[in-house]
Amino acid sequence: MTSVFDEHKPSDDSHESKIVINGEEEVLEEENDNPIEEVRLTVPITDDPTLPVLTFRTWTLGLFSCILLAFVNQFFGFRSNQLWVSSVAAQIVTLPLGKLMAKTLPTKKFGFPGTNWSWSFNPGPFNMKEHVLITIFANTGAGGVYATSIITIVKAFYNRQLNVAAAMLLTQTTQLLGYGWAGIFRKFLVDSPYMWWPSNLVQVSLFRALHEKEDLQKGQQTRFRFFIIVFCVSFAYYIIPGYLFPSISAISFVCWIWKSSVTAQIVGSGLKGLGIGSFGLDWSTVAGFLGSPLAVPFFAIANFFGGFFIFLYIVLPIFYWTNAYDAQKFPFYTSHTFDQTGHTYNITRILNEKNFDINLDAYNGYSKLYLSVMFALLYGLSFGSLCATISHVALYDGKFIWGMWKKAKTATKDKYGDVHSRLMKKNYQSVPQWWFIAVLVISFAFALYACEGFDKQLQLPWWGLILACAIALFFTLPIGVIQATTNQQMGLNVITELIIGYLYPGKPLANVAFKTYGYISMSQALYFVGDFKLGHYMKIPPRSMFIVQLVATVVASTVCFGTTWWLITSVENICNVDLLPVGSPWTCPGDEVFYNASIIWGVIGPGRMFTKEGIYPGMNWFFLIGLLAPVPFWYLSKKFPEKKWLKQIHVPLIFSAVSAMPQAKAVHYWSWAIVGVVFNYYIFRRFKTWWARHNYILSAALDAGTAIMGVLIFFAFQNNDISLPDWWGLENSDHCPLAHCPLAKGVVVEGCPVF
């Protein structure tokens, strides 16, 4: 595959760039020379630098949206029927509120004594740039805080005490450390037009539809009207899968036909098996776990689905039906941990209560830790994914990155810029590098205190924190290049668990803390630069963007921490399914995988899992496979440049395709891929004009309608225990009850036949 930077060529079409100042247009003789076709079709090349941005409306509506979404998403994250409200909902709701404030608030200006500064509750009409910053607030609130899972497993799963101040510092510092890496790499990941961040185009399209007036041809409708129509349809429809008929979210015909066959149900189940013939009639099935396919370029969809297909329909069946690693003793599709008898692993039998580490005598007298073969292979593929990312970026993009690095030090003229970069440099001051460094230093100091203070409750030593930061710094650029061009992010969660598991085994809290500092600081850095790219497209002053992101991060982290602490300390037996009342929603499904990972990597450790002492040393071969896999495709693309399909093979995407498993199931992948191919292959090529006007608007409207109806369903019906008469369609399943049953002889599992 060639470099992502050579994949698209600039258009030969010349367009005039406009800067609007005080209602008058200054026309610049520039062309829309962005090299990415989707960007040229979506992002305007106009700017009005006089528009107010950090207004009273921005702060009021932005902080309100941030707090509300942080609370709602954190609250629902503990419930069995999870709901995630995206920032699109706030983006829609705050538009009329902003316009209402513009009409009703006083316009009087207030001056600051001794300065030329002044401010007003109402500086003029509500504008698009205010709306963008409000959405950045909301997006930060909606994103959640990964570190709250540590608090949950410590207090609810392990039933241990955790100092409230240590927990608070943990949530804040893991979110803020990424600012440092963002500052270091923004030159490469934001300023370069080849780093186009596909998901941002959904937001750009929606902002334009909500704010811009259009010159329509006869018979055309505005993009805003199109959004409203799709939003209303999505909103009205979601009451069916969300409340009246949940079973249509995952339909598996094979299970309806063979109701008593375990093998048939494994083959047909879209939630617990291979999902042959399964599909969903629910937008949350399409986009809930893998994101909107409308925002992903087709070459990424093809690679992603190809990786999924190879894994689920070739590799996994071979391992399972040859009974490799005693695969048939355990369920086909699960993240649970097991002992040698095929039953759930009893972690309390091997933990020292006082020191909260492994009791080796108890472990040796009990059982080695077993995984489903699917879960074991997912770990192997995650090993290969990171190595493939390093190899791929070095082969295809190493020369470009090295040139950018040298240019950042010596060049004064931006050889790699485009019209958007020129407009930003002409109109706005960039963020000083010391702002990023200051946040990094302060965050690191507090993180060090959280780890070394409080009687070392987090178990992570100072050297572990430094190593976690070094890993995040090393991987931010290569993973950022992949995400900025494919809309897919490779996670560092497994590699960080592996490293600290070898270096500091038997310490579950040290393991999850190291993972969070290493993985989330990188992920947050890419989140920051992705938002900076949105601001780049929408011509938001970079310093205003920085301030909003920083404040929103602190506020969202505080709200998520407070919500988590409140629920854990007030809901009796939260997360403990065996002790909760029948029908209680507080089952914490999202934290179960996190808890199981802490057992695998923290308590047991990779030395007892992935070496000769354990069951799965073969997974280590994926490191070498991932490192070498991009080489033949790189060589072939160089040797046969006329073979265009070779240039589209993206090995890191293929390896990471199943990274959303086991939370994402086969039915989610199939539904996601089908919709993506229809819109970003067929419609993009056959009806490009329609696609340019409506594709990203359609994505935003489907998201918003589904999310808002989901909130209403909860508060109107589920929260008040209002339910429909019992019938089979109310089950939130695919009616494949035998798909979780093992096929091995003699394994007794409740509800399953014994072979």
Curated annotation (Swiss-Prot):
One of its GO terms (cellular component) is membrane. Pfam families: OPT (PF03169). Highly expressed in flowers, and moderately expressed in leaves and stems. It is a multi-pass membrane protein. The chain crosses the membrane at residues 58-78, 82-102, 134-154, 165-185, 226-246, 298-318, 370-390, 434-454, 462-482, 546-566, 614-634, 664-684, 697-717. It is found in: Membrane. This is Oligopeptide transporter 1. It comes from Arabidopsis thaliana.
